[in-house]
């Protein structure tokens, strides 16, 4: 296939995107990629799901951000217009400024449906790892009257911070698998693990495969290995602090976990059943799992408690497989009232405490709740936790869960960050972010941001210096598109990183002797080659000059 780097549709939208977006300086988030565009007649339109959907974000060790999203448009295949789902990638520097003048188009194959899952993570060298599933195996053989490919073949890409496709323009691909719509990836050291599920709907079967890929794009195994041979098994994998993998799944006996090395060899004599229940719900990622900083993991999940009733179960699994919360875990809401959903979890290795956030709907009241545990399984709040925020349905427009959790994070000194969405009426929401002291006896600060919005696909990331939100704004009049937000852990919007102030083009450090010259436009965005007019060129020694082409 002749790969086109950017589509005309994307260019039309990109022209309307912010020219020099950066992190917000107040409580108003920034649109990094707008779905507002101008057509050939000069009329302005707002694109919906087709123009930008399913955003994902991942942070690098040098405080940059990779953003990915998908679009659904058309492409020409042998003179015939076909449907195509594309994945795009953008890198933000630590100031939040896009580093590519236009987003990089990762894949461009005819695909009828976007009913698939892709993934984004960061390699040890700061490159982006992106997985996709598309119609590459079928595109060349489609019938003339076929709108798009009806198959999904998996592929994985590695793209460095210069925009280079390190594993080739088509990545590491497996076109022999044609029903692998769901893909995922994670990184352990210099190894990347690629996971995809290949389904056979004729006999309702599915096999989950895994491949380990070396830093240079070669594979550790001749063929992908079978990870799971069960269509309905729910699983997740967490890399440990010491380079192993914790593999979470379940059986009829309950939720279980096994420790694996990088060759997928079990490190415990048998899997550990850590709860006699397992997940009950409809989310893609069933369990909320975070490392405990000691080689183990903390997990929270939603489980059935009867018809239309749920509770949140919590467990701490030590590095040796022993269970700190007993054989059956602990309930976040330890009382016989069961309508609790959507957990989030954070762990603080410094204080050895766990915070679980969840949404509750009891007696007509929607609330965001929190429960706190020690690593040893002691409740630090009352049995039913503490209410972070709540409202009656009558005051929330009658919408279920007027208060919806977003996430939690740990601050090194023992404080906690809590974020939630306040739904006033349909398509009218806001985010509230709070910092509490360690025992929730004091609100250190509260910020309500992004009022009157309609966000979807929200990702929250907490780091030592700041909390980040990434989402897709869908509301017309609110600059719809891929949106970013940052706030420091001190409640201020001016964030200083531990390793010094932000470095811009005008003050680049002179410690890059083996770096090739790089070209930027006047907005500070990196471009692959000089544009006609004035450009900024950064030399190998770090000096910057303006050059006219």
Segments the model singles out, each with a brief description of its role:
Residues 22-500:
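Extracellular, repeat-based ectodomains that mediate carbohydrate processing or recognition
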Residues 1-5, 549:
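Positively charged n-region of N-terminal signal peptides that target proteins for export
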Residues 489-526:
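Residue-level detector of functionally pivotal "anchor" positions at catalytic/ligand-binding pockets or at interdomain
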Residues 534-549:
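C-terminal tail/sorting-segment detector
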Residues 17-21:
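Sec/Tat signal peptide C-region and signal peptidase I cleavage site
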Residues 529-531:
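Surface-exposed, short loops/turns at beta-strand junctions within beta-sandwich domains
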Residues 303, 372, 435, 508, ...:
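Intrinsically disordered, low-complexity polar segments enriched in Ser/Thr/Pro and acidic
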């Amino acid at each position: 296939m002749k790969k086109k780097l950017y589509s005309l549709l994307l260019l039309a939208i990109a022209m309307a995107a912010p020219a020099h977006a950066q992190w917000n300086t107040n409580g108003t988030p920034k649109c990094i990629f707008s779905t507002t565009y101008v057509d050939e007649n000069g009329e302005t339109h707002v694109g919906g799901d087709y123009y930008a959907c399913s955003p994902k974000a991942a942070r690098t060790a040098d405080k940059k951000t990779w953003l990915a999203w998908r679009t659904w448009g058309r492409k020409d295949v042998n003179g015939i217009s076909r449907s195509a789902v594309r994945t795009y990638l953008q890198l933000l520097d630590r100031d939040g400024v896009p580093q590519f003048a236009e987003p990089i188009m990762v894949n461009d194959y005819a695909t009828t449906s976007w009913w698939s899952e892709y993934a984004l993570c960061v390699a040890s060298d700061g490159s982006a790892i992106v997985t996709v599933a598309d119609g590459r195996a079928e595109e060349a053989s489609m019938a003339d009257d076929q709108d798009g490919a009806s198959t999904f073949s998996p592929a994985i890409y590695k793209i460095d911070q210069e925009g280079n496709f390190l594993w080739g323009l088509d990545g590491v691909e497996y076109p022999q698998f044609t029903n692998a719509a769901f893909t995922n990836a994670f990184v352990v050291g210099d190894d990347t693990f690629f996971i995809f599920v290949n389904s056979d709907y004729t006999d309702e079967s599915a096999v989950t495969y895994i491949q380990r890929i070396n830093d240079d794009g070669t594979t550790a195994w001749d063929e992908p290995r079978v990870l799971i041979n069960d269509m309905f098994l729910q699983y997740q994998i967490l890399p440990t602090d010491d380079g192993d993998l914790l593999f979470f799944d379940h059986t009829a006996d309950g939720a279980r976990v096994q420790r694996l090395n990088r060759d997928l060899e079990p490190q415990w004599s048998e899997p550990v059943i850590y709860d006699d229940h397992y997940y009950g719900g409809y989310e893609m990622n069933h369990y909320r799992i975070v490392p405990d900083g000691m080689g183990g993991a903390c997990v929270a999940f939603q489980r059935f408690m009867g018809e239309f009733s749920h509770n949140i179960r919590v467990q701490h699994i030590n590095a040796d497989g022993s269970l700190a919360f007993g054989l059956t875990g602990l309930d976040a809401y330890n009382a016989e009232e069961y309508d609790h959903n959507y957990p989030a979890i954070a762990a603080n290795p410094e204080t050895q405490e766990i915070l679980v956030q969840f949404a509750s709907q009891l007696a007509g009241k929607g609330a965001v709740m929190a429960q706190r545990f020690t690593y040893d399984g002691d409740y630090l709040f009352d049995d039913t936790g503490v209410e972070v925020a709540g409202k009656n349905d009558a005051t929330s427009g009658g919408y279920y869960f007027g208060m919806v959790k977003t996430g939690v994070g740990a601050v090194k000194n023992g404080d906690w960050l809590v974020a939630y969405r306040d739904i006033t009426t349909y398509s009218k929401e806001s985010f509230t972010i709070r910092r509490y002291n360690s025992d929730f006896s004091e609100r250190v600060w509260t910020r309500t941001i992004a009022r009157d919005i309609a966000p979807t696909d929200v990702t929250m990331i907490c780091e030592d210096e700041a909390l980040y939100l990434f989402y897709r704004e869908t509301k017309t009049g609110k600059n719809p598109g891929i949106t970013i937000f940052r706030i420091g852990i001190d409640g201020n919007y001016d964030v200083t990183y531990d390793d010094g102030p932000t470095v811009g083009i005008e003050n680049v450090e002179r410690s890059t002797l083996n770096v090739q010259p790089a070209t930027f436009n006047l907005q500070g965005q990196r471009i692959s080659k000089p544009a006609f007019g004035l450009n900024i060129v950064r030399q190998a020694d770090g000096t910057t000059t303006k050059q006219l082409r």
